[in-house]
Amino acid sequence: MTRRLRVHNGVEDDLFEAFSYYADAAPDQIDRLYNLFVDAVTKRIPQAPNAFAPLFKHYRHIYLRPFRYYVAYRTTDEAIDILAVRHGMENPNAVEAEISGRTFE
């Protein structure tokens, strides 16, 4: 089954925040983080969307190793929804509240 891939507009802001951190801390790592994101979203998740660990009810995530960032997504029969890029040390309750509010309607 081929599912439609949708990326929430908020993901751009999430990536910008991560890139801003690395612009100061390790600018040579920005391309690496971006490439891992693209690989996760365009290859790894679509190939096996249920293979990655649950994050919250109805949501899964894949870490962009070796970074501490992960991609949060959900799947339906019709689509794979990429909802956020978050740092693994963020407050889980705050992350869940924000992610659950991100819709495509």
UniProtKB/Swiss-Prot annotation:
<dbReference type="InterPro" id="IPR035093">
    <property type="entry name" value="RelE/ParE_toxin_dom_sf"/>
</dbReference>
<comment type="function">
    <text>Toxic component of a type II toxin-antitoxin (TA) system. Upon expression in E.coli inhibits cell growth and colony formation. Its toxic effect is neutralized by coexpression with cognate antitoxin ParD2.</text>
</comment>
<comment type="similarity">
    <text>Belongs to the RelE toxin family.</text>
</comment>
<dbReference type="GO" id="GO:0044003">
    <property type="term" value="P:symbiont-mediated perturbation of host process"/>
</dbReference>
<protein>
    <recommendedName>
        <fullName>Toxin ParE2</fullName>
    </recommendedName>
</protein>
<keyword id="KW-1277">Toxin-antitoxin system</keyword>
<dbReference type="Pfam" id="PF05016">
    <property type="entry name" value="ParE_toxin"/>
</dbReference>
<dbReference type="InterPro" id="IPR007712">
    <property type="entry name" value="RelE/ParE_toxin"/>
</dbReference>
<dbReference type="InterPro" id="IPR051803">
    <property type="entry name" value="TA_system_RelE-like_toxin"/>
</dbReference>
